[in-house]
Amino acid sequence: ITAQRVPMTSVPETVALFNGCGGMSSLLVALGVALFPEAGGSDLVAVVSIVVSVFVGAITFTGSIVAMAKLQGWLSTPAWMQSRLRHAVNIALAVLSLVAAVKLIASGEGGQGLWLLVIGSGLLGVGVTLPIGGANMPVVISLLNSYSGVAAAAAGFVVGSQLLIVAGAMVGAAGLILTQVMCDGMNRSLVSVLFGGALGASSGGGGGGGEYT
């Protein structure tokens, strides 16, 4: 019903919202099993799957919400996010998420490491998506679609669902292929789309790829 009522001009925002819902679903499943290990097991495979599902799911959720808000005109890029400072912030968030993931795997149970991972990866999703301009946003939405599939596949390992693993892998692969095709159509690499804006703006190059809104 929602898809039928949405005008064609708002389809990208709708897809971003659906991606966010998928990422949040995988995140909640992983959190449930992490907080209540009897629901899915606490062996190494289960813990690693929880880490992947939480990390990718949180990035997908926050990144998709930011993408939708930017396309709707509800958000704009802060000035400091257009500089190299954003790379330092994102690296710090990635390191925080990595440390939290290692701590969670080492402990094998939910706790401080789990919530640090949720916060760090969620903020990382915002930090990566917020500086990207509207012209590149469809590529980001396609990549986030791939992420939602990866998160779903990881959640499938968490709960032991082969159907969820297969479906998530298919969505992840299809989204990644579509992302690469879109990048080829724009004659740009995925790295330049995600990280090249501030570098292009600071060096005076990039053929307009550094435009931010």
Model-derived regions, located:
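Membrane-embedded transport cores of multi-pass solute transporters
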Residues: 117-129, 139-185
